C-alpha cells in the first residue's frame, strides 16, 4: 500500500457513499490509521457508518470529525451528504489516539529532553468544551517539538471527534 489512500463520495444514503469510498480505497490491509470526515447529513448514522468502514477495510484505528462541509483533492462537499476517508500506513507505535477531554485519559507522552524529532498532532476540538483553550495551550508543551494541525468541529447538530 502507498502510505496514504483517499476515498470520498456524496450520496443520499450513507451505505452507497460508504461503498464508493471503500471501492476507491481498494486494499487497505496494511493501513493502521484512518481519518474520517462526514457532513452533517450523515451525523446520525456515524456509528453505523464507522462500523461498516472498519469491517470492510480492516483498519483498526480511526479519528475524525463532522463538519458543515468537507474539502478534499479538487472536490468540495457542502450542504450535501458526504464522506471522506484518508487511510494511512504508519510505523507501528508511531502514533497514538488520545482524548484529552476525558479526565481519566492520559495526555500524550511527553517528549524526552533529547528528542528533537517533529511530533505532529492532529487535533479535533468540540467548540462547546470550555476547557478547550487550556487543553490546546498545554499540547505544545507536552509534545515538545510539536506541530498542531486541525480545528474545531463545525456542525449543526453533533460534535463527534
What are these regions (language model features)?
Residues 1-161:
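Cofactor- and metal-binding active-site motifs of prokaryotic enzymes
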Amino acid at each position: 500500500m502507498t502510505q496514504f489512500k483517499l476515498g470520498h463520495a456524496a450520496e443520499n444514503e450513507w451505505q452507497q457513499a460508504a461503498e464508493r469510498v471503500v471501492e476507491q480505497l481498494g486494499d487497505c490491509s496494511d493501513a493502521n490509521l484512518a481519518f474520517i470526515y462526514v457532513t452533517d447529513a450523515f451525523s446520525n448514522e456515524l456509528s453505523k457508518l464507522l462500523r461498516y468502514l472498519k469491517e470492510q477495510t480492516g483498519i483498526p484505528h480511526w479519528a475524525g470529525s463532522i463538519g458543515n462541509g468537507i474539502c478534499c483533492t479538487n472536490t468540495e462537499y457542502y450542504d450535501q451528504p458526504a464522506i471522506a476517508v484518508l487511510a494511512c500506513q504508519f510505523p507501528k507505535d508511531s502514533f497514538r489516539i488520545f482524548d484529552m477531554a476525558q479526565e481519566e485519559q492520559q495526555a500524550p507522552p511527553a517528549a524526552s529532553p533529547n528528542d528533537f524529532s517533529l511530533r505532529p498532532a492532529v487535533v479535533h476540538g468540540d467548540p462547546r468544551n470550555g476547557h478547550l483553550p487550556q487543553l490546546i495551550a498545554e499540547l505544545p508543551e507536552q509534545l515538545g517539538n510539536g506541530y498542531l494541525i486541525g480545528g474545531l468541529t463545525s456542525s449543526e447538530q453533533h460534535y463527534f471527534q
